[in-house]
Amino acid sequence: KMIMLPMANTTDEVKKFLKIVNKRAKTIVQIETPSLVKQLEDFKILDWDYAYIGLNDLMVASGRHNIWEAISDGTTEFICSHLKGRKYGFGGSTVIGGGEPIISDLILHEQVRLGVSMSVMRRTFKHEVLDRDLVTEMKKMRKSKSLLFGIIVMKRATNHEIFQLLRQ
């Protein structure tokens, strides 16, 4: 069992949520508001199971106009750096080479670079996997993630500049 807390504004809200759940289910807290981002030091020590950066809601709550801006301006990297050692994620996954308007490979690269341990499937996944074998596609995604991890460790490669260009 899992239960998610969306749009948390404060660590107090997260504490109340965790108290209500009382370990009867795994918890996912979505980081989707600037106010929770400002409280990461207190947030990271709470007893949640997973955190997920909701790029779309974070964009709206921050008054931005581009979903990728949180990646290009360093916000996502800042959040991830505060969550090291915990299970967290951002962005969505789909078949390798798929995805609109950003191909999944670029997002996967950033996810690996920033140490995420979870992802959700993108809206495009449903359509892109229709005529494909799901097991095969998942294996390709895992293999690509492993290869990217090796490249990043060896070369310290980054697509950060690409996301900066996309927000313009």
Would you name each region that the model predicts?
Residues 18-22, 42-47, 81-85, 111-113:
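Acidic (Asp/Glu)-rich catalytic clusters
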Residues 5-25, 35-41, 60-80, 100, ...:
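Active-site-adjacent beta->alpha loops and helix N-cap segments on the catalytic face
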Residues 1, 13, 34-47, 94-117:
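Catalytic cores of alpha/beta
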Residues 89-91, 118-123:
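Conserved active-site loop/cleft motifs that coordinate metal ions or position small ligands
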Residues 57-60, 95:
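A short, flexible beta-alpha/helix-coil linker loop
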Residues 17, 63-73, 110-112, 125-168:
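C-terminal helical cap(s) of enzyme catalytic domains, especially alpha/beta-barrels
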Residues 6, 49-57, 121:
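Non-cysteine beta-strand/loop elements that form the S-adenosyl-L-methionine
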Residues 21-32, 82-97:
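Short beta-strand/loop segments at the ligand-binding rim of alpha/beta enzyme cores
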